[in-house]
Amino acid sequence: NDKDELDINFLKDFIDKLELKAGGNPIQCRDYQFNAICEALVNKRNILLSPTGSGKSLIIYIIARYLLTKVKKKILIIVPTTSLVQQMYSDFEDYGLDSEKAIHRIYSGKEKSTKQPIVVSTWQSIYKLPKKWFDQFSVIFGDEVHGFKSKSLVMIMDKASEVPYRFGTTGTLDGKLVHELTLQGSFGPVYKVTTTQ
């Protein structure tokens, strides 16, 4: 579980080349977002505690795009609801990704296998799948992790124990220590994404 070396200037350059957009207009990666991205990439395991409005899906997007150039396997993004599967797909498209080509969506009844490099799924759709299914991933994001059932989350993360990059994101840790410890066991230490510099 060694930390990764990170070339900050290379990463800045990489983000510039993504030509990020929102609603068709160019946007910048803000400093606090950049800091969170660096933290996650160096640690390889983190829970990013990011308040509403801090551009959490943009942080996920940049980390995912960067790691796609570094890792040999796919990226799995797990969300609590079907509507969030759709939202993540649309957000990534909005930021400039060809989601149709790059993203496979899994929710009730959807095909579980794909050649696409990014898989977005509800946890309900995959927690009963065999360990072998999780072996195709190098990176796992749990988005809105406070909304996962602890038991199902542990089942997923146990099966994904070989996956080197593991990130959880949430706007809130509900103060239940047990759940928080479960999350940290699955994803690593909490990093507070502060929007005030």
Functional labels for PLM-detected ranges:
Residues 1-3:
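Charged, low-complexity intrinsically disordered regions
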Residues 7-49:
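Conserved pre-motif I regulatory segment
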Residues 82-107:
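Conserved helix-turn-beta segment of the N-terminal RecA-like "Helicase ATP-binding" lobe
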Residues 108-139, 150-155:
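Conserved helix/coil segment N-terminal to the catalytic DExD/H
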Residues 43-67:
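Walker A/P-loop
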Residues 138-139, 146-197:
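Post-DEXD/H (motif II) to motif III coupling segment of the RecA-like Helicase ATP-binding lobe
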Residues 82-84, 111, 125-127, 146-147, ...:
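Conserved nucleotide-binding/hydrolysis micro-motifs of P-loop NTPases
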Residues 73-81:
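Conserved RecA-like ASCE P-loop NTPase motor core of nucleic-acid helicases/translocases
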